[in-house]
């Protein structure tokens, strides 16, 4: 039983890494509004590097952030903290963001959810969605606040708001795909994790 659960966990970790590689590769492609290296004349490098081609283009939702939060609500044992921190740190570097800042914010948010896994198990999707919206808002505000304090350049506020709204709207879709395509669900009462411990 334990070996089967460990195998299942490994499969989901590899699935997460595969999706992360795919999404990151897509974000680095020179596609209008969705990747690095494309934008209207005069677009500043920061907006382009973060997937923002300009005010007339839609920024890409943070799919991997949605995936991390959705999986953390359902099966926190599948995403160890080093995996989350490592991926988002690499993403910071590849997308030319301040290294470590967004990774730390994401890690804090996911560990917040991990510490409340027992309570989250009883949440319906409506309550879960409200919690995630509040958490996403806190994350984006914290990121902008820290960048403002250290006087680091950051994306236009309008683009950040569009990015936030896109991520909020993408969350239910990510949850649906995780449930129907990947078979990811909240554990039943009394179900144990890969170490034989109750959730």
Question: What are the roles of these predicted feature ranges?
Answer:
Residues 1-199:
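Terminal, non-globular segments
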């Amino acid at each position: 039983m334990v070996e089967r659960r460990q195998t299942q966990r490994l499969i989901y970790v590899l699935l997460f890494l595969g999706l992360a590689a795919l999404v990151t590769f897509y974000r680095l492609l020179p596609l209008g509004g969705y990747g690095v290296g494309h934008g209207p004349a005069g677009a500043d490098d920061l907006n382009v590097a973060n997937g923002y081609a300009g005010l007339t283009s839609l920024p890409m939702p943070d799919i991997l952030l949605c995936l991390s939060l959705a999986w953390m609500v359902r099966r926190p044992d599948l995403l160890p903290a080093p995996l989350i921190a490592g991926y988002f740190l690499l993403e910071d570097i590849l997308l030319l963001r301040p290294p470590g800042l967004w990774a730390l914010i994401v890690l804090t948010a996911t560990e917040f959810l991990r510490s409340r896994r027992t309570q989250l198990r009883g949440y319906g999707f409506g309550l879960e969605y409200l919690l995630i919206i509040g958490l996403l808002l806190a994350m984006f505000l914290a990121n902008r606040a820290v960048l403002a304090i250290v006087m680091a350049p950051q994306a236009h506020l309008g683009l950040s708001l569009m990015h936030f709204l896109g991520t909020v709207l993408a969350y239910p879709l990510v949850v649906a795909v995780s449930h129907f395509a990947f078979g990811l669900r909240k554990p039943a009462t009394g179900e144990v994790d890969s170490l034989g411990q109750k959730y």
